[in-house]
Amino acid sequence: MKNYFVSIIIPCYNQAQYLVEVVDSVLGQTYANWECIIVNDGSPDHTAEVANELLKKDDRIRYVEKENGGLSSARNFGIQQATGQYILPLDADDKIAPDYVSGCIDAFKDDAGLTVVYCEAEFFGEMTGKWSLPAYTLQALLLDNMIFCTAMFKKSDWEEAGGYDEHMKNGMEDWEFWISLLKEKGRKVLKLPMVGFYYRIRGKSMVENIDPSKKMKNYEYVCKKHIDFVMEQTGNPILNYIELNLYKERLDKIKNNSLFVFCKKIKRIFDLNSTQDNRRR
């Protein structure tokens, strides 16, 4: 392996329309010691055609294909092909700032004991602005994820953690991976004070559309998988906390439902009419 060589992994499923933009953000990096692996996860669209055109732009770009297996499977497949010591996952509809890779590598050079390096982030697309995430602590990570997927880590640590869990096909696979990666004592995380990552907001972004029932199943699955660690960190109260949060989330979703709002208005009308009738009597 080349020294401080970075493998940028771009899984792609039916996102051909975004590939040029995301790869251009990789080509614009100030750090030159990288390879970019586009993983076609069985896309029925024209991902292959776009990717093959991108190969002509730079010989550091690679393209591989596989049968559809989901995001975790595609990331794992790409990382298996990677020759870099350092891995940076990057979803096909997102992009990175020109100095992001160099910032991560400088951090690893300064502190070889780091496990994960990430940065500040912003939204783009259908919504813009800063992506405000809570500060990382291991205990806070057990309650919710605050590290987006495009964070840099060592391939050797990915291997030790067992990769991304391919059973998690309904989102939140990043969260489970960070728990697997960081739960061992002594793991260090650094957040760079720079905007290096841009997360696209679109109508069907997975993060924005996880059904509460599927989210609950994800929580249950992760808690069971890492139960010893969960109990060691927080004990039983965390499970009650998770269930309470999901209950509130479901309740908010019901309250904001247009049918629920309509029924409330109808009820108010009936209540008003009933009050007026009582007064007439």
Model-derived features with residue positions:
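Conserved nucleotide-sugar donor-binding catalytic segment
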Residues: 136-221
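Boundary detector for helix-to-coil junctions that initiate low-complexity/charged tails
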Residues: 220, 224-281
